[in-house]
């Protein structure tokens, strides 16, 4: 059986990965091809992410160009983007689809910062819950005489250090994302 601290670290890593994925979906006035990862198109009856049916390039800071591998997918991709909540209108020239991202207004930037702060807070709550689970597991082991009082104290310190390390990572990610959003 894995040590509670190892289980906790795995879960904390997953929480950080989830936060990074969520942050990637927030566009900060720059074209980010990852915003298309969750936009699905109908590909021969199967919902498929756009990156799996087209090549995606970012020729300019605020433009994404989508070139489908099959011409018939142009209309499908265009429809999927219009239905999505990306907030951009696709332009279809018959060969490629261009997405032009407008400059973000100050108000929109502040909304996005609020959104990323909430995401970061949710990640911190997850980390704290994981810490609590690990500590409870160690207390149970102590109660069952599987570990000594000293072992319990050491484990509590180690779990706290792990918690602090991941909370700090969240703070760094949040700070970088806020800076990216507020950059004009």
Curated annotation (Swiss-Prot):
GO cellular component: cytoplasm
Superkingdom of origin organism: Bacteria
One GO-annotated biological process of the protein: translational termination
Compartments reported by the entry: Cytoplasm
Molecular function terms, GO-annotated: ribosomal large subunit binding
Main location: cytoplasm
Protein name: Ribosome-recycling factor
Family recorded in the similarity comment: Belongs to the RRF family.
Function, as annotated: Responsible for the release of ribosomes from messenger RNA at the termination of protein biosynthesis. May increase the efficiency of translation by recycling ribosomes from one round of translation to another.
CDD domains, A to Z: RRF
Keywords assigned: Cytoplasm, Protein biosynthesis
């Amino acid at each position: 059986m894995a040590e509670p601290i190892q289980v906790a670290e795995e879960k904390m890593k997953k929480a950080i990965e989830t936060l990074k994925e969520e942050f990637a979906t927030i566009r900060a006035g720059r074209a980010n091809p990852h915003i298309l990862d969750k936009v699905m198109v109908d590909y021969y009856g199967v919902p498929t992410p756009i990156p799996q049916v087209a090549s995606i390039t970012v020729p300019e800071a605020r433009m994404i160009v989508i070139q489908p591998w099959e011409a018939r997918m142009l209309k499908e991709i265009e429809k999927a983007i219009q239905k999505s909540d990306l907030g951009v209108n696709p332009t279809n020239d018959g060969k490629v689809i261009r997405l032009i991202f407008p400059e973000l207004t100050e108000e929109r930037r502040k909304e996005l910062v609020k959104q990323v702060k909430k995401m970061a807070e949710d990640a911190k709550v997850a980390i704290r819950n994981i810490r609590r689970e690990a500590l409870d597991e160690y207390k149970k082991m102590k109660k069952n005489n599987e570990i000594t009082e000293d072992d319990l104290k050491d484990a509590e310190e180690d779990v706290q250090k792990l918690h602090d390390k991941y909370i700090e990572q969240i703070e760094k990610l949040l700070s970088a994302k806020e800076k990216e959003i507020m950059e004009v």
